């Protein structure tokens, strides 16, 4: 039984170390965007607006599929 507990503790330690290393070294999405050059950042923002508009249209289409009676 002692070996099982020891193995579990070591396993949790190894996985925990890997997880903490990932969390500490991976930048946040905002940090990545802020580190972009101005021209790429402007392009990213423009594409982000286009994506949000497209998602809005897709959401409207899905709503129309679910509730066809609401169509005018």
UniProtKB/Swiss-Prot annotation:
Record localization: Mitochondrion inner membrane
InterPro entries for the chain: Cbp4
Disulfide bonds: none
Membrane topology: Single-pass membrane protein
Assigned keywords, A-Z: Chaperone, Coiled coil, Membrane, Mitochondrion, Mitochondrion inner membrane, Transmembrane, Transmembrane helix
Family (UniProt): Belongs to the CBP4 family.
Name listed for the protein in its UniProt record: Assembly factor cbp4
């Amino acid at each position: 039984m002692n070996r099982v507990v020891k193995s579990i503790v070591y396993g949790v330690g190894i996985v925990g170390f890997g997880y903490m290393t990932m969390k500490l070294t991976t930048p946040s999405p905002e940090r990545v965007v802020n580190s972009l050059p101005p021209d790429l950042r402007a392009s990213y923002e423009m594409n982000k607006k286009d994506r949000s508009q497209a998602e809005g249209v897709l959401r409207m289409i899905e709503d129309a599929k679910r509730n066809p009676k609401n169509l005018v």
